[in-house]
UniProtKB/Swiss-Prot annotation:
The keyword Protein biosynthesis applies. Keywords: Cytoplasm, Methylation, Protein biosynthesis. This is Peptide chain release factor 1. Methylated by PrmC. Methylation increases the termination efficiency of RF1. GO terms for cellular component: cytoplasm. One of its GO terms (molecular function) is translation release factor activity, codon specific. NCBIfam families: prfA (TIGR00019), PRK00591.1 (NF001859). It comes from Acinetobacter baumannii (strain ATCC 17978 / DSM 105126 / CIP 53.77 / LMG 1025 / NCDC KC755 / 5377). Belongs to the prokaryotic/mitochondrial release factor family. The modification N5-methylglutamine is found at Q235.
Length: 362
């Protein structure tokens, strides 16, 4: 292992010890915001600290066994010990390499899930509803909570657009590779000739950004409108102007929230979504400027970037970014996304490791 990597791992262990002490400090405990921030950092460093500890212990065990080899009575046993620990070192070093991949600070955050019908008319809206159900089922299996912020229902079912907040531990990190265009190939219920139609929906996953965290929005840049929330068929959900639409004038970004009966709650939720949209756009622009030449599995979230095809006649789902095809479409649409998401994360880790190796001269 390189000396520079050892030094970095020792520094991280020192920081972990420092955080452990800070989290026991009464002053830190009384400051909820600081306590949460430090707890998250402590949690992020715990695994890497434990693995590094095991690595150093294995090295010590090899040294001890090397000394034992000089005694004929223990030579064979010492050799076995050395070989076992060398194999363990390889395994632990692989784990450390993965753990050293720079983490997106937003990975542990809640996320906004936005699904919009694209080409395909009514069938695209129906498929938007199918995707929403798929993600809802997966969220339920993870113990996450989904809260719909706004929805525009399709005339024959599904959604022209649905925006929701997904709350839970590590939601954004788990779902961030879902942004892009999702294509469906199937025979619509309204198709009398049995022909397969192709439709598309777009999915966007945005990390929730803490409104109080280094985000400055000039109130003069906002236009806030209220209106009556409408359900399917234009029926009024309530008779007060509780729904809120906020427009960020400089960027033209528009957000809405209509699900709460309280205008105040709708405004707060719309504002949180606006902050996340603006911060995500800013980050995407920065990423584009600094990483034009490298492959990025996460993608830009560009709605024209086709990432996946759901083919119903063949019962398959294909993710085009990693050339993965799974013949279990029914299970996937019921929220069984574990194999798919794990595959995407493994590919991302492999990309990052290759990039780190290149940066470190192999």
């Amino acid at each position: 292992m390189k000396a520079s990597l050892r030094l970095r791992l020792d520094q991280l262990c020192d920081r972990h010890e420092e955080l452990t002490a800070l989290l026991a400090d009464a002053e830190v405990i009384s400051d909820n915001k600081r306590f949460r921030k430090l707890s998250r950092e402590h949690s992020d460093l715990t695994e890497i600290t434990e693995v590094w500890g095991k690595y150093r212990q294995a090295e010590e065990d090899i040294e001890t066994a090397e000394m034992m080899k000089s005694d004929p009575d223990f030579k064979d046993m010492a050799e076995e010990e050395i070989q076992a620990n060398k194999a363990l070192l390889e395994e632990l070093e692989s784990q450390l390499n993965i753990l050293m991949i720079p983490k997106d600070p937003n990975d542990s955050n809640a996320a906004y899930l936005e699904i919009r019908a694209g080409t395909g008319g009514d069938e695209a809206a129906i498929f938007s509803g199918d995707l929403f159900r798929m993600y809802s089922k997966y969220a339920e299996s993870q113990g996450w909570r989904i809260e719909v912020l706004s929805e525009n229902e399709g005339e024959h079912g599904g959604f022209k657009e649905v925006i929701c907040r997904v709350d839970g531990d590590g939601v954004y990190g788990r779902l961030k590779f879902e942004s892009g265009a999702h294509r469906v190939q199937r025979v619509p219920a309204t198709e009398s000739q049995g022909r397969v139609h192709t439709s598309a929906c777009t999915v966007a996953i945005l990390p929730e950004i803490d409104v109080d965290t280094n985000v400055e929005i000039n109130p003069a840049d906002l236009r806030i409108d209220t209106y009556r929330a409408s359900g399917a068929g234009g029926q009024h959900i309530n008779k007060t102007d509780s729904a809120v639409r906020i427009t960020h004038i400089p960027t033209g970004t528009v957000v809405e929230c209509q699900e709460e009966r309280s205008q105040h709650k709708n405004k707060a939720k719309a504002m949180a979504l606006l902050v996340s949209r603006l911060e995500n756009a800013k980050r995407a622009a920065a990423d584009a400027a600094t990483s034009e030449m490298r492959r990025d599995l996460v993608g830009s979230g560009d709605r024209s970037e086709r990432i996946r095809t759901y083919n119903y006649p063949q019962g398959r789902m294909t993710d085009h970014r990693i050339n993965l095809t799974l013949y279990k479409l029914d299970a996937i649409m019921e929220g069984d996304l574990t194999e798919l998401l794990d595959s995407l994360h493994r590919e991302y880790q492999a990309d990052q490791l290759a990039m780190l190796a290149q940066e470190n001269g192999g």
